[in-house]
Amino acid sequence: MERLCKYNYGGLIMEAQKVTQTEWLGEATKIIQGGLHRTAYLVVDTPVVGVYRKSQVDEEICNTLGYEIVETYNNASTVVHCKGDILFGHFAEIENGWYNRFIDYFVAWLKARGLNAEYTDNDILVDGYKVCGLCVTRYGRIDYTAGFIGINTNLDHIRAICRKPMRKVPKGLSDYGITSEEIEAMFLDFCKQDGGDRNNPTINYNHTT
């Protein structure tokens, strides 16, 4: 499979198309001028580690385990993404409450499936385990909400890769019988019901081979 250039979408790692930083800034300009709200997501198909600083991870272990390291531009810490995990991002010219609406929707969705879900300190937990992390980063007049939902979380790999101690222990939703396809459908349903992206449809940046 041809490796494609990385497109950092408010901390959302994409391998969808070749773009430059200038092209990305052009997209941000369109939002400022048009007041657009954009949402994107992807399903991870190759292991990747998103880092704010490379010093946060053991690069040799990443290479040994087959994880690519990609530097992000948000203020989140290191996140180890396994195949099947969901990454998503939303950005807008002004803070529009998307962050809180998504949290409420996803927690309710998990509870409807009988799971002990709660939101605390930028994370969604199930039985005390972290299954979703979010952060909001402000660049000038643009608000970025970036997040991930763990599906096939590999705790042994995370412990080996990350140099910083974990504040919360992660767990994949596959341990509760939930699949990537179900989470993808949930995310699209939320975006459709939320109605915050009338100017631009939700974009799926999956790989092409």
Walk through the language-model features, giving the residues of each:
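A glycine-rich, hydrophobic loop/mini-helix early in the fold
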Residues: V57-E93
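Active-site loop/lid in soluble adenylation, ligation, and acyl-transfer enzymes
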Residues: K6-T64, V70-Y73, R167-T209
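Contiguous, small/hydrophobic- and glycine-enriched helical/loop subdomains that border
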Residues: C82-L125
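Ser/Thr-rich, low-complexity intrinsically disordered terminal regions
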Residues: V49, S55-Q56, Y119-Y129
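Short beta-strand-to-loop capping motifs
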Residues: R53, H90-I94, I151
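Long, positively charged amphipathic alpha-helical accessory segments at protein N-termini or as interdomain linkers
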Residues: H37, R101-E118, K130-T209
